[in-house]
Amino acid sequence: MARIAGVDLPKDKRAEIALTYIYGIGKPTAQKILAQTGVNPDTRIKDLTEEEVNKLRDYIDKNTKVEGDLRREVALNIKRLIEIGCYRGIRHRRGLPVRGQRTKTNARTRKGPKKTVGARRKK
């Protein structure tokens, strides 16, 4: 099992798909990495030579921000938005959608489960 950027890649998957298990690498980035390193995208991870795995590891370390570094950068970006008090930062702080989606209905993923407000009975 190849280990790249602290992630164990599944050995039965094609290289193109297995690289997407690394946070920060999607399919287009995986294709670009494989093209740059000269590794066949259809090769299974278990069939890669040690030299090819090292090539992939070196390329990813030098040219791509992945895993912990990328997560830290995203968290710092959100923290900066919150600190400067811009609209996007306020939306993050309140746990509401940030990119202009409607909130009168929907937005349940960001808002969480419904909090039902019952009518009060008159005595």
UniProtKB/Swiss-Prot annotation:
One annotated GO molecular function is: tRNA binding
Instruction: State one Pfam family annotation.
Output: Ribosomal_S13
* UniProt GO BP: translation
Listed under GO cellular component are: cytosol; small ribosomal subunit
Region Disordered, as annotated, extends over: 96-123
Which UniProt key words apply to this protein? Ribonucleoprotein, Ribosomal protein, RNA-binding, rRNA-binding, tRNA-binding
The record's annotation in InterPro entries points to: Rbsml_uS13_C, Ribosomal_uS13, Ribosomal_uS13-like_H2TH, Ribosomal_uS13_bac-type, Ribosomal_uS13_CS
Alphabetized PROSITE patterns for the sequence: RIBOSOMAL_S13_1 (PS00646), RIBOSOMAL_S13_2 (PS50159)
The record's comment on protein family reads: Belongs to the universal ribosomal protein uS13 family.
The entry's function note states:
Located at the top of the head of the 30S subunit, it contacts several helices of the 16S rRNA. In the 70S ribosome it contacts the 23S rRNA (bridge B1a) and protein L5 of the 50S subunit (bridge B1b), connecting the 2 subunits; these bridges are implicated in subunit movement. Contacts the tRNAs in the A and P-sites.
Task: Give the quaternary structure.
Answer: Part of the 30S ribosomal subunit. Forms a loose heterodimer with protein S19. Forms two bridges to the 50S subunit in the 70S ribosome.
- Protein name, UniProt field: Small ribosomal subunit protein uS13
Organism expressing this protein natively: Desulforamulus reducens (strain ATCC BAA-1160 / DSM 100696 / MI-1)
**Taxonomic lineage of the native organism:** Bacteria, Bacillati, Bacillota, Clostridia, Eubacteriales
